[in-house]
């Protein structure tokens, strides 16, 4: 019965994703309930992988006509070459090819040179076209070639200089990671009457080359691949079949009765009078519907919203195929000892 070591652990049935101000770049991803201690274990591991191991595109070197090294200045260009290199490092790129690719930037002043003015190939996308690279005065010209490559993590400029580098090639510190920021915290959440389960909240910000939820999925897959080598056994086929037969197609909390919620007498009576038996019945109600319930006020509404939030649920949810025909049997299976 070795499979009981992982089958009996509490785990979330799905992730709750809340987009940030820029949905393509920012999101808060909530996973719960988790066994006590697993929030910290998973949060720290996922954060480290997100920041260090995801593949991305970055400029690895540049060549500017008339410039021999990065400590030069260009006539008519307000920024010196060092500042231009720093601005190029901060560009966000997305590339669909493996090998190095070259881009070209041509500009004539007076103008503000932005990333959107770069001539890219079909397999390179500039994700922040408004990003400023430099400013040209009247009569100034800029002709630059940029080399883009795929990689992971941070690679210093010294490693981006080819052995046969031509005179004037300026290597650039490459920040390949598409993930800009990751922060996590662990909160308590409740399952039934037990309140010391973990809830993991991941705040992820990317440069737009990959969405936050996809970045977390890739990080989890990397961890899965790395951990696979430590498993020195195969799960018995009977155990696999038993697991599939025992699967409950809903969040387990939805199958619990509202009687298990620690609500005030008024709130509990209102739910009972409205024939709300299971938490799955409750979460499909909207706030407006709840407030139309006799004797149910704003205080009771806030109380229920807080209790549901602790389980990663909320009012107004859409639950396909609810209620299941065998809801009583499914609910009883939750009460059965392992």
Curated annotation (Swiss-Prot):
Residues 1-24 are annotated as: Disordered. Its EC number is 2.7.7.6. Residues 1-234 are annotated as: Alpha N-terminal domain (alpha-NTD). Belongs to the RNA polymerase alpha chain family. It holds the Pfam family RNA_pol_A_CTD. This is DNA-directed RNA polymerase subunit alpha. Residues 1-10 have a biased composition (Polar residues). It comes from Rhodospirillum centenum (strain ATCC 51521 / SW). One of its GO terms (biological process) is DNA-templated transcription. DNA-dependent RNA polymerase catalyzes the transcription of DNA into RNA using the four ribonucleoside triphosphates as substrates. Residues 250-338 are annotated as: Alpha C-terminal domain (alpha-CTD). The N-terminal domain is essential for RNAP assembly and basal transcription, whereas the C-terminal domain is involved in interaction with transcriptional regulators and with upstream promoter elements. GO terms for molecular function: DNA binding; DNA-directed RNA polymerase activity; protein dimerization activity. The keyword Transcription applies. NCBIfam families: PRK05182.1-2, PRK05182.2-5, rpoA.
